[in-house]
UniProtKB/Swiss-Prot annotation:
FAD binds at residues 24-27, 51-58, 213, 356, 372-373. SUPFAM superfamilies: FAD/NAD(P)-binding domain, Succinate dehydrogenase/fumarate reductase flavoprotein C-terminal domain, Succinate dehydrogenase/fumarate reductase flavoprotein, catalytic domain. Catalyzes the oxidation of L-aspartate to iminoaspartate, the first step in the de novo biosynthesis of NAD(+). This is L-aspartate oxidase.
């Protein structure tokens, strides 16, 4: 199946764009601003606030005199269990310093003390290199970049991507929905900056609007997906919510204890190790808590250093000065994604991807804390320069497009059931039996999808199922444990699997 919805572009309201960017996180906004500074007028399509806004910890860059991009590079490789794309990782850490200057030029005001960046230490880093704005770094970056796009006069449309129109000569445009109506944007250049797919898990830190279905749309249309088995689980999400408590809290001295008051893990280990340690405590029937009192004992005022965290803890009845708070691990970051090169190009002409929906390979098997915001701005900048060149040869077509798909059935699996399947069998611990069960279940559901009613809601479920299928297939193919991917039946790393997992549409009969 190529197009899921039924449409005729000749009957839809139409707009034309030289370059269309879907998504308004750091990747999308940085790309848009960079294009505008190159003299290109991009159009942004967004369905609202995404993960960038909620990022608390910060953005990693080797900006201090006793640090270096090479040390940052080495830390990133170590955390990624040496599956990282080495060239792309060097680009991240070396060019990252210059992109920090871009962010400041665009209005971001990082914390400083006596004229120097006030950085913090996070898990997996050998140096305190995480730049921050209190504990709302993402919100600061998002609001300042959004303000910059408005100052530059970049047009923003509000709507939801439904279909990518791709024909033999590449991208031709997109179908999107706005207030229940379908509309058409004609463009030869589409940049996806739509976020990851961690929300397909029952426990997740992702906001509801970040669904990952754009990865599924691109895959359905022929794009290659890379390393989808790697899903990072944040160790410390406040139990009963999707509110994460930043790594930076542990960097400042907070400790993890079980309900016996026992410490059971080094809090500054990489996220995958900390998350699994917590998960195993919970499996044994233990409750796990994050104790912030050691932070206060160092003389740090929690409400000043972590105002957002302090505020939502107090709103929910917790006093971090007096008691530890209950936490669980939750799906947080989709490390895999649409395969791209160092300039955001996918396997489809005219289709680019930046940020969490893409896979540059820089994170390897486990993302080093606070590298994701840096990836968005570094590769957003690089993608903008490639698009500037490609615009000379890629022009919009004048042809109209139709899809005659019909159907009236309802899906025989809902999104909540899928989330439970993914959490139970494709979560922090996996094995052949569980993965095979989920794969068969998803394929069975997808085999009936051609009869589903072609509604935007069913389209969304279909594309999320495709991403879930890629994730399961990747986990089955990788018969080892590496980084965030842990197989109980293959509990160690195997050198033969120090290679990328590539998933293409022709692997499945859909």
């Amino acid at each position: 199946m190529n197009y899921f919805l039924r449409f005729d572009t000749s009957l839809l309201p139409e707009e034309e764009a030289k370059v269309l960017i879907c998504g308004s996180g750091i990747g999308g906004l940085a790309t848009a601003i960079s294009l505008k500074e190159l003299g290109i007028e991009p159009l942004i399509l967004t369905r609202g606030i995404g993960n960038t806004y909620y990022s608390q910890g910060g953005i990693a860059a080797a900006v201090l005199p006793d640090d270096s991009p090479y040390l940052h590079y080495c830390d990133t490789l170590r955390a990624g269990r040496y599956l990282n794309h080495e060239l792309h990782t060097k680009l991240l850490t070396y060019e990252g310093i210059f992109r920090i200057l871009d962010l400041e030029r665009w209005g971001v005001d990082f914390d400083k003390k006596n004229g120097f960046y006030e950085t913090t230490l996070e898990g997996g880093h050998s140096k305190p290199r995480v730049l921050k704005v209190k504990d709302y770094t993402g919100r600061e970056i998002y609001t300042k970049l959004l303000k910059k796009t408005e100052e530059l006069g970049i047009k923003i449309l509000h709507g939801e991507l439904q279909e990518i129109i791709i024909e033999e000569n590449g991208v031709q445009g997109v179908i999107y929905s706005e207030e229940g109506s379908l509309k058409f944007i004609r463009t030869p250049l589409l940049i996806l900056a739509t976020g990851g797919a961690a929300s397909m898990y029952y426990y997740t830190s992702n906001p509801k609007k970040v669904r990952g279905d754009a990865i599924g749309i691109a895959f359905r249309m022929g794009a290659t997906v890379k390393n989808p088995e790697f899903v990072q689980f944040h160790p410390t999400v406040l139990k009963g919510t999707n509110l994460l408590i930043s790594e930076a809290v542990r960097g400042e001295g907070a400790i993890l204890v079980n309900d016996r008051g026992e410490r059971f893990v080094n809090e500054l280990l990489p996220r995958d190790e900390v998350a699994r340690a917590i998960y195993n405590q919970i499996k044994r029937g233990r409750e796990v808590y994050l104790d912030l009192r050691p932070v206060a004992q160092k003389g740090i005022k929690i409400e000043e250093r972590f105002p957002t965290i302090y505020s939502f803890l107090r709103e929910r009845g917790y006093d971090p000065y007096r008691e530890p708070v209950p936490i669980i691990p939750a799906a947080h970051y989709y490390i895999g994604g649409i395969e791209v090169d160092d300039r955001g190009r996918t396997s489809i002409q005219g289709l680019y991807a930046v940020g969490e929906c893409s896979c540059t390979g820089i994170h390897g098997a486990n993302r080093l804390a606070s590298n994701s915001l840096l990836e968005g701005v570094v590769f957003g900048h690089r993608t903008a320069y490639q698009v500037y060149l490609d615009l000379k040869i890629l022009k919009p077509s004048k042809v109209n497009f139709r899809s005659e798909r019909a159907g009236s059935d309802k899906p025989n699996l809902g999104i909540e059931e899928l989330k439970k399947l993914m959490w139970n069998y494709v979560g922090l611990e996996r094995d052949e039996e569980g993965l095979t069960y989920v794969k068969k279940r998803i394929l069975s559901v997808l085999s009936q999808a051609k009869h589903w009613e072609p509604t935007p809601q069913n389209r969304q479920l279909y594309d999320i199922l495709l991403v879930a299928l890629c994730t399961v297939e990747g986990a089955l193919m990788r018969k080892e444990s590496r980084g965030v991917h842990y197989r109980k039946d293959y509990p160690t790393e195997r050198e033969v699997y120090r290679r990328d997992t590539i998933i293409t549409r022709d692997l499945f009969e859909l």
